[in-house]
Amino acid sequence: MTRFLICEHKGQRPDREAKVYHITDIEENHEVHLFENEELVEMRIYYKSSRAWGETTAIDTAEKWCLGLIH
């Protein structure tokens, strides 16, 4: 699997961080890694074939995690 880091988010909550990757092996999918206290809590994959997910949706997820809107 080939992953390219698109962006990193660190928000108002210093213990939270998120990284957004672009995956190019099969389709143009996006992967979001959600960290809390430097530990991977969750990984979300947005498959382009199942819906019209895009880079914007992945980045929005990362921002919402860092702002504390996702628990």
Regions found by a protein language model. Name each.
Residues R3, C7, E39-H71:
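Mixed-charge, Lys/Arg-enriched low-complexity segments
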Residues M1-N37:
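Short N-terminal "domain-start" leader segments
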